[in-house]
Structures are given as structure tokens and as C-alpha cells.
Amino acid sequence: MDLHTAVYNAAHDGKLLLLQKLLAGRGREEIEELLGEVAGGGTPLLIAARRGHLDVVEYLVDNCGASVEASGSVHFDGETIEGAPPLWAASAAGHLAVVRSLLRRGASVNRTTRTNSTPLRAACFDGHLDVVRYLVGEHKADLEVANRHGHTCLMISCYKGHREIARYLLERGAQVNRRSAKGNTALHDCAESGSLEILQLLLGCHARMERDGYGMTPLLAASVTGHTNIVEYLIQEQPGHGQLSGTELPGEGSSQMAGNHCSTPEEAEPYESCCPTSREAAVEALELLGATYVDKKRDLLGALKHWRRAMELRHQGGDYLPKPEPQQLVLAYDYSREVSTPQELEALITDPDEMRMQALLIRERILGPSHPDTSYYIRYRGAVYADSGNFERCIRLWKYALDMQQNNLEPLSPMTASSFLSFAELFSYVLQDRSAKGNLGMQLGFADLMGVLSKGVREVERALQLPKEPGDSAQFTKAIAIILHLLYLLEKVECTPSQEHLKHQTVYRLLKCAPRGKNGFTPLHMAVDKETTNVGRYRVGIFPSLQVVKVLLDCGADPDSRDFDNNTPLHVAAQNNCPAIMDALIEAGAHMDATNAFKKTAYELLDSKLLAKSTMQPFNYVTLQCLAARALDRNKVPYKGFIPEELEAFIQLH
């Protein structure tokens, strides 16, 4: 173990005497170096603050000159927090004595992490009320500094269910109607976490029932998460039935703080006087809650109970609230339509599958196609069908969800990427199942695979149309890899000449985009790289793949394309010891003597132990023109500007 690591470990374990011994007699510069970051990004002071070793913290600051503001990486609950100052770590862990000590020694009370989280937010997250009181009461910590998502200290306290911290923040003037980047408020966080007491507290402080960026009210948020207690409280009988938002709440006009914050929560107005819920909103909340009971709680009888109440409210007083008529019935939902009468509703009890379709229909109507839960539960239902062997039904639902995601989410959304990967894994399983069972297995058709492959290419096209190109982002690389896996599977399906033509057209669309993955890899580079195999938890295709390489070459992939290290696909194939693929690339016109940034040819990268290296004769593929190009490069003969551009590119290749 080196000295740097030994110092860090001593600070981690709180071994002050050992730490003093390790640092004794060393010069200032050496001590500064030893107190710097270790390989994981942490520092001795940061880890000592995280672990609550007060004596070590004070020794490092007072005797060794460690900076109280030096940030680093620290781990909490399995997550790595980047750019965390020692005060943040001590606050998050609830070590009040260390917090006091660091602040007395000049630590900034509002210093943030890389994600803009303050020490106060860290203390609010895990419910350290004593630390919160000290930071705010003694050092005037800013209550309103939000993290990079616009999420405030009050919001996280509400979400985590820390009632006393929420009460204290409200007493100190926290803005109760502050919105995050996605438009949600502290009320939304209460509704999502099921914290009814805090929700009552916020409502008493004039919290408004606003809609977030997805159009969700706190009432709908409670329905989506299945918190029946919140839903029941918010839809209780009101003296009047106003709108959920957009109307002035009592008291707002007379008091400036009514819509902002509440200084005395104990004197809060009762809920009934400030936030009435309309009949329509109550109906939707109950219907959505029923859908949650079906898909999340898997309680069909509980769902039916909530849907009955919603139906009663729709017909209340003879003033019927009709459901909107669907524009068209959906194949993925088995052409189901929402029930509209009590008789139709009661008939569902004999048809559990129809109840599940009702849940999907209700969720799509109320939340809309852009809400993540809509497509998530469609995919979930499809997965349940797949688990029971009903692959056709699964594929229909997943295709519908994928169309929804591509039409409503940004390109390369993690949810869309997950859909593509799920398709690839499902298709791989079905093909293996068919191979094992013969005619008894499901017949996976060309249209199924081709449809998803085409949508995958469309996703790449959408990503490349963004103002900022994705470059070598991991998500973009994964998207290309999944397309190659789908192509790998498609090669296992028999095609007619017209289907073969359609497949080649789609691959040509991909190549025309000229997408580049990690390290500037083209699709052809990725097809000859074994790393492309690792795309998900389950194996789909095996790479390098000669079949995929041949399809790419047939569709016009450039065998001499270069990555950021000037490697051609031939170089990558050689690094992966694939002589058969090298032969295919050479036959397609790849230059055997092309050199990379390290002046190595593909032949030189081949494993010398391979029999193929001894049988492969590079001079069989080298022309006089190639030898001349290498001679010019080797002898540093100036040629740029003196010869045609095509020849310049040819020389640079060598």
C-alpha cells in the first residue's frame, strides 16, 4: 500500500495517532500532495467528515492546512456524489459536531456539489433536523438554492416524509409554491410519497394545486403512485366545486405571503376553505387510481371499487359527465373501448384481461402519450404476456409503446433505448425458442424484426438532426449497437427478394447518416468489435459478426473508414483476431497496408500465434501504388498541394 492510500485509510477509520505518525516530519508540499484526491476522487478530510471523525477533521485543518472547501467524490447510499465539499458530507451524514467545526473554520454554508446540492439540502434529504436547524438558524443557510433539477430543500423534505423539517423550513420562510425544472411543487412531492400530514401542512400554508410539466396535479400524482389516503383526502366533499388551478385562492389577494410561504403553520387555514376539487378532477383521480391498482398493486377488486365510485360520480345528480370518444380503436389494446355504463363496468369482473386493457386505456386518456407512465405500463403489460408465452400480444403492445415514445420523447431517451433493447432480447429469445421447439415455437416474422429495425434507424436519424450532435455519447453508441444486434437477428430469418431489398434500403439509410459511436467507430467498426456483444443483461447477438459485416459492405459501408485513432475496420478485426472477417473486408477493397495513428498495419496487430497470420500474405494485397504512398510518407516527401486531393487521401491512408 502506498503512503497516499495509507493516509486516506487512516482518515477513513478515524485513526488519529496513525495519521499523525504518517504525516510527521514531512514538508508542506508533500503534505499537500498526501491530502489530495486518491484514485476514487475522495480526500482524507472529505472522508473524515463523512465518517464523523471530529478529531481527525480538526487535525487535518488546523495542523496540516487542509482546505475546508476542497471538494471531491463521496459515496452515499450506493451513489457517488461528485464535487462534494467536506461540509456537505458531514451534513448529509448528520454529524453536527463536524458541521459546527467546519463552519467555525471558514467553510461556506452554501457551497454546492457538482449537481448544485447544498449542505442544507443534504441534511434535509436524510432527515437530520438538528443539522438543518443549525445551518439555517445559526448560519443563515439559503433555503431556496435548488439542485440542478430545480428541486428545493422543502421539496426533498416533503418527498422523503420529514414532517418536522418541512414545518421548520416553512416557519423560516421557504417558498411553498416554488416550481422545479419540470414544473412540480412540494405538493407533488407529498402526493408522490404519500405524506398526508405534510400535504395538509402545505395546503394550510396556501400551497396551490398546480399542474406540472406533464399536466399532472398533486391529486393525479397521488393516483399514479397509488396513495389512496392522499386521493381520499383531496376528493372529499367540498363546499363548492371550483377548478384545480387558475382561480384565486381565498386570502391570496389580501396577503402577499399567502401564495408564497407560511410563517405560522399552526395557524394554517383548513383545506376545505382553500382548494376545492371539481367533480371532473375527482372522477379522473379515481379512474387513474383504479388503473394503478390494476398494474402496480395487482388488485383487480380494489380497482373495481375505485372505478365504481368514479362511475357514480359521473352519473351524480343526473348530470352525466361523458368520457371523450376515442378517435380510433387500437389493435394493441385488442380493439377495447372504455366502459361507459355501470352494467359494462360490472361485466369486467368476469374478464380480468379486459380489466387490464381498461387500465391502459384510462391511463393513456388521462395522462396522455407523453407521460412516461403511459408507455411504461404498456410495456409492463406486454412483458407479462411474454412471460406467459403470448409473444404476439407482447410485440403488439411494445410496438405501440415504441411509436408513442418516438412521437413524444426526445431522441435517445433512456426509455426509448430500453424499448429497443427489450425488443432485441425478446426477438433473440423467440428465435432460440423456435429453434428448440421447431414448428411448435412462435413464428417470428420478417415484418416484426424489420419494423423495429426501421424504427431504430429512425431514432439515429432523429438524434443526428438535433442542434448539438450526439458525438460519441454512450447512449448514441448503444443505439447503433442495438441496430446491429437487430440486423444480426434479421439475418437468421428467411427473406424474399423484395424483403431483402427492403432490408438493404434500411441499412443504407443508416449508413447514409454516417453515425459515429465511441472513439469515432462507424457501424462497420462496431460490427467487427467484440465489445458490441455487450449491449444488455442478456446476450442477443455475437460480435464480431461476418454476416452483419457482409450486409453493411453490400449496402456501401466504407471498408477504409477511420476512427479517432485512424484505425480502419480491418485494424479492429485484427485486434479481435478475426481473419475470416479480414478476408471479407479485403475482398471489399480494404487496404491491407493502411496504417493507424501508431503507424501499425492490421497485419501487424494480428496475434502471432494464430495460424491465419502465417497463411495470410499481406503482399498479395499490396499494389505498387500502395508501396509508393508508404515510401512518400516514410521519407517525409512533401506532397500536399502538389497532387490531386484523391491521391492525398490515398497517401494519408498509408
From Swiss-Prot:
Residues 241-265 are annotated as: Disordered. Residues 253-263 have a biased composition (Polar residues). GO terms for molecular function: EP4 subtype prostaglandin E2 receptor binding; molecular adaptor activity; ubiquitin-like ligase-substrate adaptor activity. Phosphorylated; highly phosphorylated in myoblasts and myotubes. Phosphorylation at Ser-108 and Ser-608 promote PGE2-EP4-mediated inhibition of inflammation. Dephosphorylated by protein phosphatase 2A (PP2A). One of its GO terms (biological process) is regulation of ubiquitin-protein transferase activity. The keyword Phosphoprotein applies. It is found in: Mitochondrion; Cytoplasm. Pfam families: Ank (PF00023), Ank_2 (PF12796). ANK repeats lie at residues 2-31, 40-70, 82-111, 115-145, 149-178, 182-211, 214-243, 519-561, 565-594. Pathway: Protein modification; protein ubiquitination. The modification Phosphoserine is found at residues 108, 608. InterPro entries: Ankyrin_rpt, Ankyrin_rpt-contain_sf, TPR-like_helical_dom_sf. Keywords: ANK repeat, Cytoplasm, Mitochondrion, Phosphoprotein, Repeat, TPR repeat, Ubl conjugation pathway. One of its GO terms (cellular component) is mitochondrion. TPR repeats lie at residues 283-317, 375-408. Substrate-recognition component of a Cul2-RING (CRL2) E3 ubiquitin-protein ligase complex of the DesCEND (destruction via C-end degrons) pathway, which recognizes a C-degron located at the extreme C terminus of target proteins, leading to their ubiquitination and degradation. The C-degron recognized by the DesCEND pathway is usually a motif of less than ten residues and can be present in full-length proteins, truncated proteins or proteolytically cleaved forms. Belongs to the fem-1 family. Component of a CRL2 E3 ubiquitin-protein ligase complex, also named ECS (Elongin BC-CUL2/5-SOCS-box protein) complex, composed of CUL2, Elongin BC (ELOB and ELOC), RBX1 and substrate-specific adapter FEM1A. Interacts with PTGER4. Interacts with NFKB1; the interaction is direct. This is Protein fem-1 homolog A. It comes from Rattus norvegicus (Rat). The lineage of its organism: Eukaryota, Metazoa, Chordata, Craniata, Vertebrata. The gene is Fem1a.
